[in-house]
């Protein structure tokens, strides 16, 4: 059967829980509004759920251009881009970026939740972050995602993993942007270029997984046995790491919708 787009996931705030969409606008940085916000520590270094599993417990959604953050135990906070503060330099992996700080109440909200001084920051249109040139074309850019505009995983790949696990895991542990149907597990490994709806994407690099999938998205607690990464390591290890999913770079703008056909072009 031909592949189709089965779900779309946007993560407005880096490492927080995201939102599932019926349709989305694709831009050069990925899904519109995806990972434009993140938290940084007192030294300006980015913070993720790798170190703070509780970030999974934050729900991040967009209301027009405003970011809304909520948890089960704290009041919802709304951050409007028109209320941003000073510009500061921060570190995201090896990149040094100029970003805008959020309002003071946003910093206080996030600091209280994480139990340490942090600042909420926003990537605006004045700052440009290049994709790794080893896998990109000149001018390709990315938001505050780890390295690439989008991540695609087939449901068949997750099914293949769950068939090896005593306790099944959810797709959201792997934080995909796009989930597609496929006839066999890891079919996406062989794709080089695809079209979803009217938008084309280059499939540029397998995704090397870190410890984040071991954190339960509903509790924020890391699995004491190291699953599912322990099992993935047994059959998905390569010279570049433990691979699961494919990173994409869009080659045009447009709207994609759940149910759109996925056409393999190369």
Per-segment meaning from a language model:
Residues 1-266:
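Metal-cofactor-dependent catalytic cores
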